[in-house]
Each structure stands twice: as C-alpha cells, then as structure tokens.
A protein has these predicted regions:
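Catalytic cores of the polymerase beta-like nucleotidyltransferase superfamily
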Residues: 1-226
Length: 227
C-alpha cells in the first residue's frame, strides 16, 4: 500500500463540492474513517469533471443513519448502502466490505448478497477496477493506493482486481463496465481481461436483473465516447 500526497496526484479540496466535504466531515467528527472513492477520484486525477462523488467508511449503514438522521436512507438488499442527502445533492455512502465467509451466489457464481463488513484493506480487493480503488482523504491530503492504481491511470490501462474470470462471474455487469470505461476514458484493456472476454462469456448476463442490465446498457450507449 502506498500513501500518496493528494497534491502530487493533482487533487485538492478546492476541486470538491461542499456536499461531499460535508459528508466526509460529519463521519470523521463522529469518530469514523471516511474517504472519497471510485470514479470521482479517478476523474479528478485524469483532469475530468466528475458528475458525482461516492464515500466509503468503516461505519455500518445503521451507524451512518445515526450520524445523518433523516438525511439518510438505507437502500439495497444485495449491497446495502446509505444514501445521504446534503442539501439537494445525494451522496452514496458504502461500508468497507470483507470477503464473504460463505458467499450467497447463483449457480454461475454471481454474488447475490454481499453485506460482510470489513476493513479498508479488505475493501479494496472487492472493488472492480484498480482505477476505481483509490481512497482519498481530503482533510488529511492523502490518497491510499493499494494496487498501483496511480500507475494504471498514468498509463491509461484498465485492469481488474483479482482473477478476471472470477470477477466477471461474481458480477457479470462488469463486462459491460469494462467496455464503457475503456471507451469513455480511452483506456486500453489489460491482456488478461481480453483473454477471457469472449462472446461466449455473455451467457453470464442471463442471471443479471433486467433493471441492472438496462441501467448499465443505457450508460454504455448514451455516453458519447462509448457510442
């Protein structure tokens, strides 16, 4: 794990809207760890303007609810999350996840339920792509990089964390996300993904709910660069 200076990654609090800082500050004040994670951090490092920001914390959904009260709504069964409102803005706040002791999966290996809370070290390996696994603590001015994600961003490489076949079986929607991110960000796809990213692998998508499939397909075809 590398602890990088945010300034060296081109990051500063001046780039952040007040609503995400409000969420990070409230969780920190309550005694919890809190980071900005995912596409927001990735896009800032690429010099892009993120459309939203997500947070992650060691607080459980019920504890997040205690911090924010009526501003918070717990959603999800497969992946339990907290939706926190800051003014008119919505921030998705997730709890650090650990590998399931006994995964609830479909016959094809897709994870059907994943609410095993863990540490930040356990959480990063549960994420899909390395470029989405950067943990930014804006008040401390640091970025935690567990998987050389900064190098992947620098070299514009899309790389899955873990074995690609297993990660696609866990969540087949990642196949569509691979295509979308590669096109949207103009990244090359790592060879180990291309090796198993075949038309035959599309059968995994049969287990995905119509809602999730529609949502990700819509993102794929409505993004200008993806099209």
């Amino acid at each position: 794990m590398q602890t990088l200076r945010a300034s060296k990654c081109g990051l500063s609090t001046a780039q952040l809207p007040s609503y995400i800082l409000d969420v990070i500050d409230a969780l920190t004040k309550a005694g919890y760890e809190a980071y900005i994670v995912g596409g927001g951090v990735r896009d800032l490092m690429l010099g892009l303007n993120p459309k939203d920001f997500d947070a992650v914390t060691n607080a459980t959904p019920s504890q997040i609810k205690e911090v924010f009260g009526r501003r918070c709504r717990i959603i999800g069964r497969r992946f339990e999350l907290a939706h926190v409102y800051s003014g008119r803005e919505l921030v998705e706040v997730a709890t650090f996840r650990a590998p399931p002791k006994k995964a609830v999966t479909s016959a094809q290996g897709m994870i059907l339920r994943d609410n095993n809370w863990g540490t930040i070290e356990q959480d990063f390996v549960r994420r899909d792509f390395s470029i989405n696994a950067m943990y930014y603590q804006p008040r401390k001015g640091i970025v935690l990089d567990f998987c050389n994600a900064a190098d992947d961003i620098k070299h514009k490489t899309l790389r899955l964390l873990g074995d690609p076949q297993t990660r696609f079986e866990e969540d087949p929607v990642r196949m569509l996300r691979t295509l979308r991110f590669a096109a949207k960000l103009n990244f090359s796809i790592a060879p180990e993904i291309l090796d198993i990213f075949t038309p035959e692998a599309a059968y995994l998508l049969r287990d995905v709910s119509p809602h999730r499939l529609y949502d990700e397909s819509q993102k794929l075809f409505t993004d200008r660069k993806s099209v």
